[in-house]
Amino acid sequence: MEQTLVIQKKKGFGFSQGIGITLLIAIAAKYLAELPFLNIMGQLVIAILIGMVWRAAIGVPHDAIAGTNFASKKLLRFGIILLGMRLNLVDIAKAGPKVLVIAAVVITFTIFVVYGLTKVFKVEKKLGILTACGTAICGAAAVVAIAPQVKAKDDETAVGAAIIAILGTIFTLIYTLLYPVLGLSPYGYGVFSGATLHEIAHVIAAAAPGGSTAVDIAVIVKLTRVAMLVPVAILIGLWFGKSEGSEGKRSWRELPIPWFIFGFLAMSAVHSLGIIPEVVAGYIVVLAYMLIAMAMAGLGLNVEFKTFRKLGSKAFVAGLIGSVCLSVLGYVLVYALGFM
């Protein structure tokens, strides 16, 4: 009996230790993300990288793994639900149908192109899907939301999120340098940035040279892409299940529907109705990013650098080429739809 209690206490301490490590990393990532240049990468990406460094330098106690796994799975879903508080459906509606069109076109195009490229480069199927969706929709958040749909492993999820983050940072710097020669108005440049960059942090940083006009519309266009995470996640789950040969009748609980995504949509609806004060909504978004950062830390703590090198090199090249194609398409659409 006493031995059982000792084992339970040890497991409980290990679980708490795992949660504590991810929280510590998430807090460190938040403050580091406020520094020049690192703010382009954002809290989520920095959390993954710190987690990987922590594992390589310090290691993760065996008993703490249960806590880091809890963070990377359960806390992740709760964080994504709360992240819906950032999305205002009214603002998206006011932006007009052209914004919906450009978001739908770039997402569809990018998923097919990037996934096609990953097949050409013989990237593992699940990592290819994650890379495609992360590039097309909303970076790391899309990667971790789609991961359960394709039953991706933690290392595939972490590598996919890191690849998208690095690509987004590179293209953010390129956009900032190219802004004076693109020939776009601040409004058009904002649409271009919001339609083609990977993370919200990337969009805001890249649009900054165009002023508040560019940043405001860039965020709206980007959040329109984020809103499409719900249908894309469902479609990816259905397609993946069919491609893997899933047969037979399944209960509604077994359908490839990420139910937590509907929580995300519900939070968006609540925010859109104006029920919650903006100040409170802002704090909820901060909490959402903290929880997702803890999840990212948990993923990073489960990945070794050699795994990243092994899995990530070909996927990175595919994502790089796909991102170039996305940028070209976005630029063409800005002109074609009259956003100049």
From Swiss-Prot:
Compartments where found: Cell membrane
Entry keywords, A to Z: Cell membrane, Membrane, Transmembrane, Transmembrane helix
GO (cellular component) term, any one: plasma membrane
This protein's record includes keyword Zinc-finger: no
Membrane topology reported for the UniProt record: Multi-pass membrane protein
InterPro entries, sorted: UPF0324_pro (IPR018383)
Main location (coarse class): membrane
Signal peptide: none
Membrane recorded as keyword: yes
Membrane-crossing segments per the record: 13-35, 40-59, 99-118, 128-150, 157-179, 189-211, 218-240, 255-277, 279-301, 316-338
Similarity comment: Belongs to the UPF0324 family.
Protein known as: UPF0324 membrane protein BC_5174
